[in-house]
Amino acid sequence: MPQDNITIRNATTEDAARLLAIYTPYVEHTAITYDIRIPSLEEFRRKITDVSRAYPFLVAEVNGRIMGYCYAHRFIQREASSHCAEMSIYVEQDNRKTGVGRRLYAEMEDRLRKQGIHNLYAQVTWTDEENEYLTNASTAFHERMGYVKAGHYHECGRKFNRTFDTIVLEKII
């Protein structure tokens, strides 16, 4: 899919069902998210509304169909860190490695820069040995986008009767 066919726009609460459909397989079949329970449609609508009050919540469309989304939120809940944001991104599983994630992050970084954000962080589930629940593709994506490893939390996630590490990746914009 050529990247020029991808349209980026702000998410609305009307997008919640589609975004939830993208997110659900990540909850059910991967350790990419530590959510164990799929949020309700109303919870997802509320998330879009709450995030959008202070940060961008973006969707990527191709021919009117949403293929992925990303949003930013406060990284540390202290005033001295208000120039920092944490990133989250989810792309429809069949549309990974198509440019959707790159376009979402490029637009997000541009908007956050204009908003006065200076530091971006991504907390990514990590495994020393890839398995059916987790590869390190998210880490590789972030590194391609210019993020560098800034921290490592050991065995901080439990899902599918296993423990997973989380690494913190950072990018100064």
Label for each model-derived stretch:
Residues 112-134:
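Conserved GNAT acetyl-CoA-binding A-motif
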